[in-house]
C-alpha cells in the first residue's frame, strides 16, 4: 500500500498549507495507514506529528529534507528515520543543518537507522555519494532513464490539501519573498493530498517494485520516546542529597531558626524531595539565585506555591517564612501526586541576558537552550499581508484592520461588524482576498523565542530534542510542551520590571540619602505603608494599581499585612462576592460562623471565609484526618470540578470525619462549603509572596516618594505624572541649559526630560546636553549642527519654553525662526560682529502655553492657568482633595472631557464630565434639567466654577452638578476696517462655538458692537481664519 512520505507541513514556513490536525483527519478519509512529514531542514513539528499519528491510529514516518554541498554540487536528500535510533540521528542532523554546520562527513557518521532518498528531479547518473540510497519517483518520472542498479521508491510531494489551495500557497510565497503576486512564480500543480488507493493502483501498474520497496521500508518503522526525567547533576563530586541537607541546615542557622518546629519541618521536606528525585533541582535553582545576588541583583520574594517550602526559604529561593505564616509544602510538592516542582525564577528584567550567559557557561552550551515559540498569522497580519498584494493602499488597510478587535478572529469580526462586512463585500477582489486571509489565519509565520523558558539536561540536549542556533544560546526546535513531554527540565526565567524598580529604588535611596535599605527585611506591618494601602494610593504598586484593586483597598482599608494578602485573594471573580461579609465580620457587624471549634484557628484569620486553597487542605487534614498530600489531591479535584473524583473524595472525607467522632451532617455541610470555595480559592503561598513584593514597592512610595516617582517615571512606560501631582509634586519649568534627558525628581519638583518630546532625535538630545551651556537663542542655533536645524526639531523646544531664559516671548522666537536660521548660516558668518534684528510678536496666552506643553511633553510645565484664576478669585471654592461626601461644595476646575448620553426613560440628554483642579480628578454628573440650561457653556479645556452635591459611588467621590459658571470673564476683541466682511467673520466665529463673548470695533466709523448670539472658543486656528478679514484680535 502507498505511504505518503514527502509532505511539507506549515512548519516549512509559508511553503505549505498542511497543518497536522487536518493532515491526520484527511489522511484517514483518504484511506492511509502510514503517513510522513518531510520539512526542509527543521523538525519543528516532529514530536507532535508522531504523537498525533499514534493518537489517530496512523503509522508515522519522520523525514527530513536537507540540501548538502558535496564535490562542488548541491545534493538534495530526503532522510527517513527507520527506527528510534534513526529518530535520534535526525535530531543531530537537523541541529547541524539549522546551525550551519552540516557537511558530508558529519552526515555519513549519523546515518545509522536512516534511509536516504534522492528525488528523481535531483538525481543524475553522474551523482556519486558515499552511501546507499533510493531514487524517489512520482507519476511524472521517466523510468527509462533511471539507474537499474538503484532501488526506486514512490515519493510524491504534498504541500496542500486540494487544488483550490494553490492560489493561497501562491499568496504565501509572495508574502514570504516580499513580492507582488505578478512577480511570484506560480505554484507547482499536482501537490495535493490524493486518495491512497488511487496512488497504490498507479504504482502497482507502473512501478510495482518501487511500491514493494516502500512497503518494506515502512513496515517496521516505530519510534519510542524516553520520557524519564533528565535533571542535570549539580555537583558530580558530591551527593545532591547531602549537599542540599547541608545548605538548608546552614540557611536556617543563619536565620536563627535552627529549632523546632523548623527542624522537623525541614527533615520532612528533605525526605519528600529526595524520594521524588528532586535534590539536584533545588540546588540548581539555589545556584541560579545565588548568582543573581552575587551580582547585586534584587531577586524578589519568590512566587507561586514554592513560597510554602521551608527548603526554598532556607536556600533564599523565597523570602517568606512558611512556618511563621502557616504555608503548606504539600501545596507545592506532593508525594502522592508526582509532578515536577515548578519554581519560576523572577529576576530584574534588565538582567535576563546575564542569566542566560551564566546558564550556558555553568551547565554547558550543549546542555542548555532557550525554547522556541511560533509566531502565527493573526487576523490583522493576515488581512494586511494578503490585501497588500491585491494592491490595497496603506490607508485602506489601516482603516480595515482597525475594525478587528484584540480577541477577534476573521470569522467573528465578519459576523459581528457590519462595517467590516460591508468593506469585504464591496469588491470581488476583497472577497477573494478575505477568503485567502481566513485560510492562512493561525498558520505559523516564523519562529520566535519563549519569553521566559530555558531547557536544561544532564546529557547533550540533541540526544533528546533538535536545536537550532540563536544569538545568546542555542534554541530548541520543539516547543515547551514537547520538551517537558521528553522528560527535560524546563525553567522559566521571568524578567519582572517590578524587581528592577525595587533594585533601582534601593540604589537611589543609598545614593541620595546615604541609607542602605535591606528591602527584604522591612517590617511588613509598617504603619506608613499600611496607611498607603488603606487609602488606595497604590498607582504603580505591583498587583494593586488597577482601579478594581484600588477600589477594593478603599473598601477593606487593610489594617495589617495579612489583610493585604486577603485583598489580593478577594480581588478575583467569585471571591469578591464575599468582600462585604469580610468587612462586616472584621468590624463586628456580622456573625462569624467557624463551623466547628477544631477548625476555628484555620478560619479565624479570614473571618470564617475560605479564601485560600490551603485552608481547604488544612480543614481536610484537621477535620477528617487526611494527610496533606491527600488533602492536596482533594483540592485539585475540587478546583478542576472533577465530579467523579469529588464524589469518591466526599465519601472518604465523611467516613474519615465520622471515624474522628464528627457528626455526619456537619461533615457533609462542611464538604459542600469547601467545594464551593475551592473553585475560586487562591494560592495563599503565591498571594503572600506577591503581596510582600507589592509592600516593598509601597514602602518606597510611603517613605521615599521622590525616589519612587523618579524610578517609575524613568523605567516604566506608564504615566505616573498625574499620580505624582496628586501627591503634591509640582512640574518645574526647565530651560535649554537645565533640562535632563530622562525625567528627574528633586525634593517635590518634577523636571521633565527631553525624551518626552515626540520626534526629537536622541542624538540631538544628547548633543544639547553635551554642548551646553548656551547664552542666547542665536548662540544655540549657531552651534546646532545643520542636520538638526529643522523646524520640526526646533519648534517643540521653543513651544515648551526651553528658551524663556533668553526670550520669554515664545511666539516671537517662532515667528523669527526662519530669519534666525538664515542669519546663523549665512549673514552671521559674513558679518561676525552683526546682530540679528528681531521682529516683535504677541506672545501666547498662559492657557495656550500650557496647552502646547501638554501636547508636546504630556504635561504642562509652566504655571497652570487655573492656579492664576484661583489666586485672583474672590469666590470661595473647595479643592477636590478636601471634598466630603453628602455635602454641598463649589469647585474650581478645568473640563477634561464631556460624555453626552440620553436617558432610558425620557430620552433627554444628560452629561458626564471628567474634570481636574490640577491636583486631582473628579467625575461630575449633569442631569437633563441642568444640562439643558448649561450645555451651550460647556467646552472641553475651559475653566469653570461648579456647584453641586458630593456623592460616593463605587467608593469614589463624584459631584451631582447644580450650577455652572465660567471662571474667566475675558472677551475676544476684533478690530476691523468696516462692515465689508461681516458675513465671512460671522461664519468663521460660528465655526468655533464656546463661552467667550465677542466684541467688534469698526475703525472707520468708530462703532463698537457686542455680539449677543455668538460666543467662541479662542484658538490659534480661529485667529488664522480671521486674519484676512480683521486688522487685529485681542483676547482680554
Curated annotation (Swiss-Prot):
Keyword Transferase: yes
GO function terms (MF aspect): 3'-5' exonuclease activity; DNA-directed DNA polymerase activity; nucleic acid binding
Principal subcellular localization: cytoplasm
InterPro entries: DNA_pol3_alpha_NTPase_dom, DNA_pol3_alpha_thumb_dom, DNA_pol3_finger, DnaE2/DnaE/PolC, DNAPol_HHH, NA-bd_OB-fold, NA-bd_OB_tRNA, PHP_dom
Cystine pairs: none
One example of a Gene Ontology biological process annotation: DNA replication
Name assigned to this protein: DNA polymerase III subunit alpha
Amino acid at each position: 500500500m502507498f505511504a505518503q512520505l514527502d509532505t511539507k507541513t506549515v512548519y516549512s514556513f509559508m511553503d505549505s498549507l498542511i497543518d497536522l490536525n487536518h493532515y491526520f483527519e484527511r489522511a484517514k478519509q483518504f484511506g492511509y495507514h502510514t503517513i510522513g512529514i518531510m520539512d526542509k531542514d527543521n523538525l519543528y513539528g516532529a514530536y507532535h506529528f508522531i504523537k498525533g499519528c499514534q493518537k489517530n491510529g496512523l503509522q508515522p514516518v519522520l523525514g527530513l529534507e536537507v540540501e548538502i554541498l558535496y564535490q562542488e554540487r548541491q545534493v538534495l536528500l530526503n532522510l527517513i528515520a527507520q527506527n528510534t535510533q534513526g529518530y535520534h540521528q535526525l535530531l543531530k542532523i537537523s541541529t547541524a543543518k539549522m546551525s550551519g554546520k552540516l557537511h558530508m562527513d558529519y552526515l555519513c557518521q549519523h546515518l545509522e537507522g536512516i534511509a536516504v532518498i534522492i528525488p528523481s528531479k535531483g538525481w543524475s547518473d553522474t551523482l556519486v555519494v558515499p552511501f546507499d540510497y533510493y531514487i524517489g519517483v512520482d507519476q511524472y518520472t521517466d523510468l527509462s532513464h533511471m539507474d537499474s542498479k538503484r532501488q526506486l521508491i514512490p515519493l510524491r510531494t504534498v504541500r496542500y490539501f486540494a487544488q483550490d489551495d494553490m492560489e493561497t500557497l501562491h499568496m504565501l510565497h509572495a508574502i514570504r519573498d516580499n513580492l507582488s503576486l505578478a512577480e511570484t512564480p506560480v505554484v507547482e500543480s499536482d501537490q495535493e493530498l490524493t486518495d491512497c488507493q488511487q496512488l497504490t493502483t498507479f504504482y502497482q501498474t507502473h512501478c510495482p517494485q518501487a511500491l514493494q520497496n516502500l512497503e518494506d521500508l515502512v513496515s517496521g518503522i516505530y519510534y519510542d520516546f524516553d520520557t524519564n526525567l533528565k535533571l542535570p547533576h549539580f555537583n558530580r563530586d558530591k551527593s545532591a542529597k547531602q549537599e542540599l541537607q547541608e545548605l538548608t541546615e546552614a540557611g536556617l542557622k543563619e536565620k536563627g531558626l535552627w529549632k523546632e518546629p523548623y527542624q522537623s519541618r525541614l527533615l520532612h521536606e528533605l525526605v519528600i524531595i529526595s524520594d521524588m528525585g528532586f535534590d539536584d533541582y533545588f540546588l540548581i535553582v539555589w545556584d541560579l539565585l545565588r548568582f543573581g545576588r552575587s551580582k547585586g541583583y534584587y531577586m524578589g520574594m519568590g512566587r507561586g506555591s514554592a513560597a510554602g517550602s521551608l527548603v526554598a526559604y532556607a536556600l533564599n529561593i523565597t523570602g517568606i517564612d512558611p512556618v511563621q505564616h502557616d504555608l503548606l509544602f504539600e501545596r507545592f510538592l506532593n508525594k502522592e501526586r508526582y509532578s515536577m516542582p515548578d519554581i519560576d525564577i523572577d529576576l530584574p528584567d534588565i538582567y535576563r541576558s546575564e542569566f542566560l550567559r551564566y546558564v550556558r557557561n555553568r551547565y554547558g552550551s550543549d546542555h542548555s537552550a532557550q525554547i522556541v515559540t511560533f509566531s502565527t498569522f493573526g487576523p490583522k497580519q493576515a488581512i494586511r499581508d494578503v490585501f497588500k498584494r491585491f494592491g490595497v493602499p496603506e490607508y485602506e488597510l489601516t482603516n480595515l484592520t482597525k475594525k478587528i478587535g484584540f480577541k477577534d478572529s476573521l470569522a467573528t469580526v465578519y459576523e459581528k461588524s457590519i462595517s467590516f462586512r460591508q468593506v469585504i463585500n464591496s469588491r470581488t477582489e476583497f472577497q477573494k482576498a478575505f477568503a485567502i486571509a481566513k485560510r492562512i489565519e493561525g498558520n505559523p509565520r516564523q519562529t520566535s523565542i519563549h519569553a521566559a523558558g530555558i531547557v536544561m539536561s544532564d546529557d547533550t540536549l540533541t540526544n533528546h530534542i533538535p536545536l537550532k542556533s540563536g544569538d545568546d544560546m542555542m534554541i530548541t526546535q520543539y516547543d515547551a510542551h514537547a520538551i517537558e513531554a521528553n522528560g527535560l527540565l524546563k525553567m522559566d526565567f521571568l524578567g519582572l520590571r517590578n524587581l528592577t524598580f525595587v533594585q533601582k529604588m534601593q540604589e537611589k535611596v543609598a545614593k541620595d540619602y546615604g541609607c542602605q535599605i535591606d528591602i527584604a527585611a522591612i517590617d511588613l506591618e509598617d504603619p506608613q505603608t499600611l496607611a498607603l494601602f488603606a487609602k488606595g494610593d497604590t498607582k504603580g504598586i505591583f498587583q494593586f494599581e488597577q482601579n478594581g484593586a484600588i477600589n477594593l483597598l478603599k473598601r477593606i482599608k487593610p489594617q495589617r499585612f495579612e489583610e493585604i494578602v486577603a485583598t489580593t485573594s478577594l480581588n478575583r471573580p467569585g471571591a469578591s462576592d464575599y468582600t462585604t461579609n469580610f468587612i462586616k465580620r472584621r468590624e463586628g457587624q456580622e456573625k462569624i460562623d467557624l463551623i466547628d471549634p477544631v477548625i476555628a484557628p484555620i478560619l479565624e484569620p479570614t473571618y470564617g471565609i475560605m479564601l485560600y486553597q490551603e485552608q481547604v487542605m488544612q480543614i481536610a487534614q484537621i477535620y477528617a484526618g487526611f494527610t496533606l498530600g491527600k488533602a492536596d489531591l482533594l483540592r485539585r479535584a475540587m478546583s478542576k470540578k472533577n465530579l467523579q473524583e469529588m464524589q469518591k473524595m466526599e465519601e472518604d472525607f465523611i467516613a474519615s470525619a465520622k471515624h474522628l467522632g464528627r457528626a455526619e451532617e456537619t461533615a457533609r455541610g462542611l464538604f459542600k462549603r469547601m467545594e464551593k470555595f475551592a473553585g475560586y480559592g487562591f494560592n495563599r503561598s503565591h498571594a503572600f509572596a506577591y503581596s510582600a513584593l507589592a509592600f516593598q514597592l509601597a514602602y518606597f512610595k510611603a517613605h521615599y516618594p521622590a525616589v519612587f516617582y523618579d524610578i517609575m517615571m524613568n523605567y516604566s512606560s506608564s504615566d505616573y505624572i498625574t499620580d505624582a501631582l496628586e501627591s503634591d509634586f509640582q512640574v518645574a519649568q526647565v530651560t535649554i541649559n537645565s533640562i535632563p534627558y530622562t525625567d528627574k525628581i528633586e525634593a517635590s519638583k518634577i523636571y521633565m526630560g527631553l525624551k518626552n518630546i515626540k520626534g526629537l532625535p536622541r542624538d540631538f538630545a544628547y548633543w544639547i546636553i553635551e554642548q551646553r551651556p548656551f547664552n542666547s537663542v542665536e548662540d544655540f542655533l549657531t552651534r546646532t549642527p545643520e542636520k538638526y536645524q529643522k523646524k520640526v526639531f526646533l519648534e517643540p523646544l521653543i513651544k515648551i519654553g526651553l528658551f524663556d531664559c533668553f526670550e520669554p516671548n515664545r511666539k516671537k522666537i517662532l515667528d523669527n525662526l526662519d530669519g534666525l536660521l538664515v542669519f546663523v548660516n549665512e549673514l552671521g558668518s559674513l558679518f561676525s560682529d552683526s546682530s540679528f534684528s528681531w521682529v516683535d510678536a504677541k506672545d501666547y496666552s498662559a492657557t495656550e502655553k500650557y496647552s502646547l506643553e501638554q501636547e508636546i511633553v504630556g504635561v504642562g510645565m509652566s504655571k497652570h492657568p487655573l492656579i492664576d484664576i484661583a489666586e485672583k478669585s474672590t469666590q470661595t471654592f473647595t479643592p477636590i482633595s478636601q471634598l466630603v461626601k453628602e455635602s454641598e461644595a463649589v469647585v474650581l476646575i478645568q473640563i477634561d472631557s464631556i460624555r453626552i448620553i440620553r436617558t432610558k426613560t425620557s430620552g433627554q440628554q444628560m452629561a458626564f464630565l471628567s474634570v481636574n483642579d490640577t491636583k486631582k480628578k473628579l467625575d461630575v454628573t449633569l442631569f437633563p434639567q441642568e444640562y439643558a440650561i448649561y450645555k451651550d457653556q460647556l467646552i472641553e479645556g475651559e475653566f469653570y466654577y461648579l456647584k453641586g452635591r458630593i456623592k460616593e459611588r463605587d467608593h469614589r467621590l463624584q459631584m451631582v452638578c447644580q450650577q455652572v459658571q465660567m471662571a474667566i470673564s475675558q472677551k475676544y476683541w476684533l478690530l476691523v476696517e468696516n462692515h465689508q466682511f461681516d458675513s465671512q467673520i460671522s461664519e468663521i466665529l460660528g465655526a468655533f462655538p464656546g463661552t467667550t463673548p465677542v466684541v467688534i470695533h469698526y475703525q472707520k466709523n468708530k462703532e463698537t458692537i457686542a455680539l449677543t448670539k455668538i460666543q467662541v472658543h479662542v484658538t490659534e486656528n480661529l485667529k488664522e481664519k480671521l486674519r484676512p478679514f480683521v486688522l487685529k484680535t485681542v483676547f482680554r
